Amino acid sequence: MDKHRKDCCILINSTPKYYSILVLQVALLRRYAAKLKWRIFLATEQPEHEICKRLVQEFGVELVVLTDQESGFLESRLAGVGKLPPEIFYVLPIQDDFILDREPMYDMLAEACNILDIDRNVASLRLMPCPGPAVNDPVYIPGKVWRILTDNDDMVFTYQATLWRRIDYYAFFKELLLGVKRDYPDAVTVEQKRHVALNVNCAEISYGQNLLKTLGGEMILHLAYPRAGPWSNAVYLCPFPYRPTAIVRGKLEDFAKELGKREGFPVVF
C-alpha cells in the first residue's frame, strides 16, 4: 500500500465542547495507524485554542478554520470538506469521539483507494460494518469482499467511518443542507439547527438515504465492507476498527475514560 498518498486524508469535525477528547483520538490515530501517513485535518472554529495548537505542534494536525456561520453540525461538514486543499481527492471523515485502538487493515484501505482510482462510479466505501451491508447485497467484484449497498439496506449514508470521493461527499451535504433549509425553515438558531441535524437526524434517516440513492444517478455506487458475523465485536474485524461514540448525550463513556488513562492521554470532560 502507498501509505504516503497525498490525495487522501482523514477529516475530523469538532467544536470546543468536545476538544478534550481530541488529543486521545489523534494520539491513537498516530499510534495504531502509524504506517498510515495520510494528512489529518481538523475542521473547527477556534484554531487558537490550546488543544488545537497542541494537535498541530505535537501530532502534525492541519487546521481547517470555520466561521461561526459554518460551525453548525451539518454546515461544518460541508465547509470542512469544501475548504480542504485542492490536491485532496479522497476523504475519510470521522466523528470526534471515534477512537481507533487497534491497527487498521492497510491492505483493505489500499484496495478502497484503488477502487476509487479506477472506477468513477464508486462514490464511497464504508469501512466500519455498523451497520453492515445486507447479506444478499451483490458483490462488487467477484473474488473481492466489497458489497454494493442496495434498497435491501436501511442505511446507505452513515456517519460511521467511510472513505469518500471528496466531490461526492461535498455534493451530498450541499444538497442535504438545501433540503433542510427548505423543509425546516424555522430552524434558524444554532440549537434549532443542531436539533434537526442530530435529533431529527436528517442525514441518516429516510431523508438523507433517499437523497444519496438518487444523487448522481443510478450509476453511482456505494460499497461496504461486510460484517464478519452477528456477534457484537465482529464490527472490529474491518478496515478501520475504532471504538465508536465515546461521548453519549454529553457524557464521556466509561470505556473512553479507562482507555485514555491506559494509553497515557487521560480525558477530562
What do the PLM-derived regions correspond to, one by one?
Residues 25-29, 50-60, 138-145, 191-194, ...:
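Short, aromatic/basic amphipathic alpha-helical patches
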Residues 171-269:
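C-terminal catalytic/acceptor-binding lobe
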Residues 16-20, 47-49, 98-101, 132, ...:
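Short acidic, S/G/P-rich loop/turn micro-motifs used as interaction or catalytic elements
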Residues 88-99:
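Short beta-strand-to-loop acidic/aromatic patch adjacent to the donor-nucleotide binding site
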Residues 139-154, 168:
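Short, flexible, basic/aromatic active-site loop/helix in glycosyltransferases
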